[in-house]
Curated annotation (Swiss-Prot):
<comment type="similarity">
    <text>Belongs to the MscL family.</text>
</comment>
<keyword id="KW-0997">Cell inner membrane</keyword>
<dbReference type="InterPro" id="IPR036019">
    <property type="entry name" value="MscL_channel"/>
</dbReference>
<comment type="function">
    <text>Channel that opens in response to stretch forces in the membrane lipid bilayer. May participate in the regulation of osmotic pressure changes within the cell.</text>
</comment>
<keyword id="KW-0406">Ion transport</keyword>
<keyword id="KW-0812">Transmembrane</keyword>
<dbReference type="GO" id="GO:0008381">
    <property type="term" value="F:mechanosensitive monoatomic ion channel activity"/>
</dbReference>
<protein>
    <recommendedName>
        <fullName>Large-conductance mechanosensitive channel</fullName>
    </recommendedName>
</protein>
<feature type="transmembrane region" description="Helical">
    <location>
        <begin position="81"/>
        <end position="101"/>
    </location>
</feature>
<keyword id="KW-0407">Ion channel</keyword>
<keyword id="KW-0472">Membrane</keyword>
<dbReference type="InterPro" id="IPR019823">
    <property type="entry name" value="Mechanosensitive_channel_CS"/>
</dbReference>
<dbReference type="InterPro" id="IPR001185">
    <property type="entry name" value="MS_channel"/>
</dbReference>
<comment type="subunit">
    <text>Homopentamer.</text>
</comment>
<keyword id="KW-1003">Cell membrane</keyword>
<dbReference type="GO" id="GO:0005886">
    <property type="term" value="C:plasma membrane"/>
</dbReference>
<dbReference type="InterPro" id="IPR037673">
    <property type="entry name" value="MSC/AndL"/>
</dbReference>
Amino acid sequence: MSFIREFKEFVMRGNVIDLAVAVVIGAAFGKIVTALVDKIISPLIGVMVGGIDFSKLSLTLKAATVDTAGKEVPAVVIGYGDFINTILQFIIIAFAIFIIVKMINKVINKQPLPPETPSEDVLLLREIRDSLKK
C-alpha cells in the first residue's frame, strides 16, 4: 500500500474528521469564553470588589529607569491580573465541558440497547435441538 493511500485512509476515518471538527469548534468556543471573561465577568467582579480591572493588576519588581546612555530600561512587571482572567476562562471552559459530557452521558444511558435477534443459523440450530429433545 502506498504512503499516500495510507494517509488518505487515515484522514478519511471518522475519528480524524471528528477530531478536526472538535478542534475548530473548540477554538471558536475558546474565543467566546475569552470575550465572556474579559468583557463581562471580569468587569462585573471588578465592580463588586471595588472597581478593579483584573487585566491591569500587576506587581512591579523593578521600576523603569533610564541608563547612563539615556536609554529607557523597561520595568520588570509580573502581570498576575491576566493570570486571574486565564484561570476564570479555564474554569468556565471546564464547567461547560462537564455539562456537555453530563448531558451526552444522560442521553446515552437513556437509550436502551435493542435486544439481539438471533441469526437464521442459530434459529435453525435451536429448531434442530428442540426436535431432537422430543
